[in-house]
Swiss-Prot record:
Ranges for domain KH type-2: 39-115
GO biological process, one term: translation
Domain of life: Bacteria
Record's protein name: Small ribosomal subunit protein uS3
Signal peptide: none
Family note: Belongs to the universal ribosomal protein uS3 family.
Known function: Binds the lower part of the 30S subunit head. Binds mRNA in the 70S ribosome, positioning it for translation.
GO molecular function list: mRNA binding; rRNA binding; structural constituent of ribosome
Record's keyword annotation contains Glycoprotein: no
Keyword rRNA-binding among UniProt keywords: yes
Keywords, ordered alphabetically: Ribonucleoprotein, Ribosomal protein, RNA-binding, rRNA-binding
One cellular component (GO) term of this entry: cytosolic small ribosomal subunit
Subunit structure: Part of the 30S ribosomal subunit. Forms a tight complex with proteins S10 and S14.
Length: 223
């Protein structure tokens, strides 16, 4: 089961939390879901060069939306004197639905810096995709990503690239593994990502698994 299922969804509720934290009535659910999709799509498109890894959206009231952006380049997102993040907040507010008085929802943005981007599966996959689009040999791109992740402290990493590799006529799959990646162990902190590289010979799929160690339950102090 652990070999087939998405490792992120497999661990939600065990060692990983939801990326969207809100509850809505049946009448409001679809509207809020589409709001989330618009917000995520806008951030991913306009902050494509800011190494954004994860976007969390939380709603405490119907008129407030809290957006947490995890990025390896917080300075690029915040801008000089907070100018860029203020522009982003204004644009995200315009993407939300208005109330009866025509007012948009209040949007609050929290920027979280990623200390070790080489331990993020999405950022590693994006790096490999960028190398492949620049015509770097796929084996060199994969081995370079594995070496950087290992130096950053990864317990294990697996990278899989599929498609017309190096312009071959027949598509195939190549994969490299370093260390251990225990997919069946629920306490194992495994970050997973699927990314895509658009090359002259077609699109290449990139799957990345990074094992960052075990997440053990906190022991309660006995009185």
């Amino acid at each position: 089961m652990g070999q087939k299922i998405n490792p992120t969804g497999f661990r939600v509720g065990v060692i990983r939390d939801w990326d969207a934290k809100w509850f809505a009535d049946k009448a409001d659910y679809a509207n809020q879901l589409h709001e989330d999709l618009r917000i995520r799509k806008y951030i991913e498109k306009n902050l494509a060069d800011a190494s954004v890894d994860r976007i969390e959206i939380e709603r405490t009231t119907k008129s407030r939306v809290d957006v947490s952006i995890q990025t390896a380049k917080p300075g690029m997102v915040i801008g000089k004197g907070g100018s860029e993040v203020e522009k982003l907040r204004t644009q995200l507010a315009k993407l939300t639905d208005t109330d009866e008085k025509g007012r948009s929802k209040r949007v609050f943005i929290n920027i979280v810096e990623i200390k070790k981007p080489d331990l993020s599966a999405h950022l590693v996959g994006q790096q490999i995709a960028g190398d492949l689009e620049r015509r770097v040999a796929f084996r060199r791109a994969m081995r370079g990503a594995i070496q950087r992740a290992t130096r950053s402290g990864a317990k294990g990493i697996k990278v899989m690239v599929s498609g017309r590799l190096n312009g071959a006529d027949i598509a195939r799959i190549e994969q490299y593994t370093e260390g251990t990646v225990p997919l069946h162990t629920l306490r194992a902190d495994i970050d997973y990502s699927w990314d895509e590289a658009m090359t002259a010979y077609g699109n290449l799929g990139i799957k990345t698994w990074i094992y960052r160690g075990d997440v053990l339950p906190q022991k309660k102090n006995s009185k």
